[in-house]
């Protein structure tokens, strides 16, 4: 769905035709009418204006907030029990907003950020070490922005700690590049933000939910005391299953990691307060 109905129809037709050659019999439809949501079990929200070079994700809040509110009203009317996956930026704030107006539990409304941030970090680790990205495990928590918290002691290559291969200085460079990964792409493309990697990240989460795979993936979830925080949406490791977000996994953090997480949470809390004031 898109406010530009014919654009959505064209993209849907293109995807449908691509799916045929991959052996899929799924029919793909597009349009602008909210009635298309009727009976949906899972809705992914990506609508909104992209940020421009030099802007933060929070800079597009005033524009994207009313867009999200309109979509949530349509979802509540046509698919009130649907699981909602928020991707629009600023994703932490908009996930919180979507949950707060949905009338549903946190298991049914959550966001995508950490899967993408983790993929970026794995890409940079593979580039730096020369090893296959398939053998790299990584984890990113916190807000989706410069305050995100890559947990480097959980990063491994083929079950070997990352610190065995890279110096602390090299690891810190990867951390900083991961935090600014979206901005790097935005600066290079000039006229648009990342789309392919976010699309793959969304597909992973949708697959986990639609097929009940019980996958552990980072998601922007509403915290209810986990990691010492409440009434906030933050990126944390979650179990995604058939009904949505089955549970949050609370990892033990050392003092430095907890301090970084708290710093990130404080920033997200300020952003949410700004949203409430609009």
Curated annotation (Swiss-Prot):
CDD domains documented for this protein: LDH-like_MDH
EC number: 1.1.1.37
Gene Ontology terms: biological process: lactate metabolic process; tricarboxylic acid cycle
A Pfam match: Ldh_1_C
NCBIfam families on file: PRK06223.1
PANTHER family xref list: L-2-HYDROXYCARBOXYLATE DEHYDROGENASE (NAD(P)(+)) (PTHR43128), L-LACTATE DEHYDROGENASE (PTHR43128:SF16)
Protein name per UniProt: Probable malate dehydrogenase
Binding-site residues, NAD(+): 64, 87-89
Active-site residues (renumbered): 144
General function of this protein: Catalyzes the reversible oxidation of malate to oxaloacetate.
Keyword Oxidoreductase among record annotations: yes
Family: Belongs to the LDH/MDH superfamily.
Residues noted as binding substrate in the record, renumbered to the chain: 51, 57, 89, 120
Catalysis: reaction(s): (S)-malate + NAD(+) = oxaloacetate + NADH + H(+)
Keywords: NAD, Oxidoreductase, Tricarboxylic acid cycle
GO molecular function annotation: L-lactate dehydrogenase activity; L-malate dehydrogenase (NAD+) activity
């Amino acid at each position: 769905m898109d406010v530009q109905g014919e654009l959505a129809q064209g993209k849907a037709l293109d995807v449908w035709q691509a799916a045929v050659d991959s052996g899929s019999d799924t029919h793909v439809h597009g349009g602008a009418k909210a009635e298309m949501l009727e009976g949906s079990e899972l809705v992914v929200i990506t609508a909104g204006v992209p940020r421009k070079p030099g802007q933060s994700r929070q800079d597009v809040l005033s524009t994207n907030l009313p867009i999200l509110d309109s979509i949530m009203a349509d979802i509540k009317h046509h698919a009130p029990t649907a699981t909602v996956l928020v991707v629009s930026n600023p994703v932490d704030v908009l996930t919180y907003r979507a949950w707060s107006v949905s009338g549903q539990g946190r298991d049914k409304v959550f966001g995508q950020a950490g899967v993408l941030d983790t993929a970026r970090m794995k890409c940079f680790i593979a580039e730096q070490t020369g090893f296959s990205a398939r053998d790299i495990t990584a984890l990113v928590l916190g807000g989706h922005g410069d305050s995100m918290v890559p947990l480097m002691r959980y990063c491994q290559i083929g079950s070997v700690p990352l610190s065995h291969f890279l110096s602390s200085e090299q690891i810190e460079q990867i951390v900083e590049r991961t935090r600014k990964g979206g901005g790097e792409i935005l600066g290079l493309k000039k006229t648009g933000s990342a789309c392919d990697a976010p699309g793959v990240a969304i597909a992973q989460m949708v697959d986990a939910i639609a097929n009940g795979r019980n996958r552990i993936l980072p998601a922007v979830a509403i915290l209810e005391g986990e990691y010492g925080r409440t009434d906030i949406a933050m990126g944390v490791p979650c179990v995604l299953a058939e009904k949505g977000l089955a549970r949050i996994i609370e990892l033990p953090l050392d003092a430095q990691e907890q301090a970084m997480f708290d710093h990130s949470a404080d920033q997200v809390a300020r952003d949410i307060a700004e949203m409430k004031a609009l």
